[in-house]
Amino acid sequence: MAEETNQSLEDQNVQVEEGQTISDEAIEQAVEGAEKELDNAKKEIESLKDSWLRERAEFQNYKRRTANDLLNARKESIKKFAEGLTGALDNLERVSNVPNQTPEVVAFVEGIKMVQKEFYSVLEKEGIKRLDPKGQPFDPMLMEAIASEESAEFTEETVVETYQAGYYHEEGESKQSIRPARVKVGKPQS
């Protein structure tokens, strides 16, 4: 601070010779000038600090958005991939359910069932599950009602028959339909 005062005095062209005294007014002016410079420097530091904090917060938000975007892109890729597999899985299901199999075909069908099981295992690791809701309450988010029947035996809308299995992606409590199960719904009589 003494250096700033001397600098301020030099700026005011005050020359002090040895043995001379500086007036109180000159000292006050030098101190006021130094205090103004200090206040300006503090304000600039505060401004730069605020700017840095805003930039840091913006960068943190950018990182969070990017991570969410990557996660959503991954989920969407898995979903698209699973959508493409549903037809092939349906065909494997049809082959494995062929009635009146000859002994030669039985071994082949068993191999198909093993491949089918492996597909389901891989899909489940990614949170994709097969839905065959026969006997379960009807869920319009995961099922599509193709037909319905009314009966006194039903107290709520219940799946009576599954025409085509559905697939959904499960993450925590959330279930997102990939392909709805096509079902026949039993309804209570009105």
UniProtKB/Swiss-Prot annotation:
Spell out the molecular function terms from Gene Ontology.
adenyl-nucleotide exchange factor activity; protein homodimerization activity; protein-folding chaperone binding; unfolded protein binding
Q: Which UniProt keywords apply?
A: Chaperone, Cytoplasm, Stress response
**A single GO cellular-component term on record:** cytoplasm
Per the record, where are the segments of Basic residues compositional bias?
181-190
User: Which residue stretches belong to region Disordered?
Assistant: 1-22, 170-190
Where in or outside the cell it occurs: the entry states: Cytoplasm
The keyword Ligase is assigned to this record: no
CDD domains to which the protein is assigned, alphabetical: GrpE
Q: Any one Gene Ontology biological process term? A: protein folding
Q: What is its main location?
A: cytoplasm
The record's listing under PANTHER family reads:
GRPE PROTEIN, GRPE PROTEIN HOMOLOG, MITOCHONDRIAL
Q: How does it assemble?
A: Homodimer.
Query: Per its database record, what is this protein's job?
Result: Participates actively in the response to hyperosmotic and heat shock by preventing the aggregation of stress-denatured proteins, in association with DnaK and GrpE. It is the nucleotide exchange factor for DnaK and may function as a thermosensor. Unfolded proteins bind initially to DnaJ; upon interaction with the DnaJ-bound protein, DnaK hydrolyzes its bound ATP, resulting in the formation of a stable complex. GrpE releases ADP from DnaK; ATP binding to DnaK triggers the release of the substrate protein, thus completing the reaction cycle.
Q: State the family it belongs to.
A: Belongs to the GrpE family.
Name this polypeptide is given: Protein GrpE
Organism of origin is Leptospira biflexa serovar Patoc (strain Patoc 1 / ATCC 23582 / Paris)
